[in-house]
């Protein structure tokens, strides 16, 4: 490949059960593939999506991007609320403008809002500790650490089933775009707890096939249900406690045990 094209897709923050980043990321993935096909057809050059390159560390070296203490990339005007895709081209493509990109400065200094807001203290003075991040353990197929289970579906924690954006919500660099936050979700908690074939298909279409794993969805949903309204969902949690899935059954049994306290 002789040229690289970085595609940026901004999105509006929101979602309670499912963070809007994940649907935006899936949409960006498909848009990048369509763009590659279009470049190949209209420009007569080979174009393909580069999935083997890590974009976050690449962007840290580019002056247009800032980097937060949460290790996320930031851009002027949209903060950290964007998805990235990279295309590799066999030949450079003429651009309409050579205007310089705005410099992305992120004066974190001694702000510390993200570190103070993180419920698991994953952002420290020495850097970001991914093993402490709730998102790191979500939908992994393994049981979440016990100290994190009470935070799923809780206003004090992630509030949802997939995604934790607390550090982004409180960041001053996201102040403007946070004005457009919505609580809209594509699924209800009841739908996720049932997780029918239709729900899985919709889930795959919106978030991607990689996330459409029934047991992994249920393992997160049962924690959210138990923390949100344990009595309302007790019967469903009891049924899921018999699941052959280790993570799902352990999460359900944990919630039932803690309901009795």
Show which residues each predicted segment covers.
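Loop/turn-rich, solvent-exposed surfaces of beta-rich toroidal or solenoidal domains
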Residues: 177-178, 206-227
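Structural detector for internal amphipathic alpha-helices that build alpha-solenoid repeat scaffolds
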Residues: 218-228, 250-259
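Iron-sulfur cluster-binding cysteine motifs and their immediate structural context
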Residues: 113-138, 157-184
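Short coil turns that connect the paired helices of HEAT/ARM alpha-solenoid repeats
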Residues: 203, 208-213, 239-248
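Auxiliary alpha/beta "docking" domains used to position bulky ligands
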Residues: 1-107
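Amphipathic alpha-helical scaffolding segments comprising HEAT/armadillo-like alpha-solenoid repeats
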Residues: 186-189, 199-203, 230-241, 260-261
């Amino acid at each position: 490949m002789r040229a690289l094209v970085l595609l940026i897709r901004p999105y509006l923050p929101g979602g309670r059960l499912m963070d809007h980043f994940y649907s935006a990321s899936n949409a960006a993935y498909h848009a990048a593939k369509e763009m590659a096909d279009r470049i190949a057809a209209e420009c007569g050059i080979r174009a393909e999506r580069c999935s083997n390159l890590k974009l976050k560390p690449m962007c840290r070296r580019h002056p247009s991007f800032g980097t937060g203490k949460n290790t996320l990339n930031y851009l002027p005007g949209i903060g950290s609320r964007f998805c990235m895709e990279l295309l590799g081209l066999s030949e450079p493509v003429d651009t309409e403008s050579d205007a310089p990109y705005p410099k992305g400065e992120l004066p974190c200094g001694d702000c510390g809002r993200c570190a103070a807001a993180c419920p698991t203290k994953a952002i420290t003075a020495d850097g970001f500790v991914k093993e402490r991040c709730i998102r790191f353990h979500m939908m992994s197929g393994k049981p979440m650490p016990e100290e994190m289970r009470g935070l799923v579906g809780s206003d004090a924690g992630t509030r949802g089933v997939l995604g934790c954006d607390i550090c982004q919500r409180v960041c001053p660099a996201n102040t403007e775009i946070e004005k457009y936050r919505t609580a809209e979700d594509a699924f209800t908690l009841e739908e996720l707890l049932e997780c029918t074939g239709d729900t899985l298909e919709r889930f795959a279409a919106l978030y991607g096939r990689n996330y459409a794993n029934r047991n992994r969805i249920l393992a997160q949903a049962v924690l959210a249900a138990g923390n949100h309204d344990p009595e309302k969902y007790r019967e469903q949690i009891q049924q899921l406690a018999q699941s052959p899935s280790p993570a799902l059954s352990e999460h359900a049994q944990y919630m039932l045990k803690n309901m009795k306290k």
